[in-house]
Amino acid sequence: MRVIFTCGGTAGHVNPALALAGLMRQRDPQTAVLFVGTPDGMERELVAKAGYDYAAVEVDSFRRSMRPEAMRHNLHAAGALARSGPAAKAILREFRPDLVVGTGGYASFPMVKAAVQIGRAHV
């Protein structure tokens, strides 16, 4: 089985995915696992420490403010969100997962949405 876990933002999103990946590998050592998160999110370090492969999709949070710096940030976030869809689909085409598991955080949105769009099993 080939599984993508997508998560990020906090250890509360990442650690359940790591636990599930470990369980799946324990039951079937041939399970291929890929984690997908953001380029510089804390999830990258946690996944590396656990020994799993990692791919990144640029996505950012939106700020709920009308201040100029928040507006600039949101413009950047909107651009990243627009680019994240094609990047997520490219990862899906290359890895060819049987299942995509999203455990939360804004980093999981592009991968789960792409899985839905191309008809991949997802949770």
Predicted regions: what is each one?
Residues 20, 84-88:
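Generic hydrophobic alpha-helical segments
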Residues 13-24:
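Short amphipathic alpha-helix
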Residues 3-10, 30-83:
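Conserved nucleotide-sugar phosphate-binding/catalytic loop shared by glycosyltransferases and other
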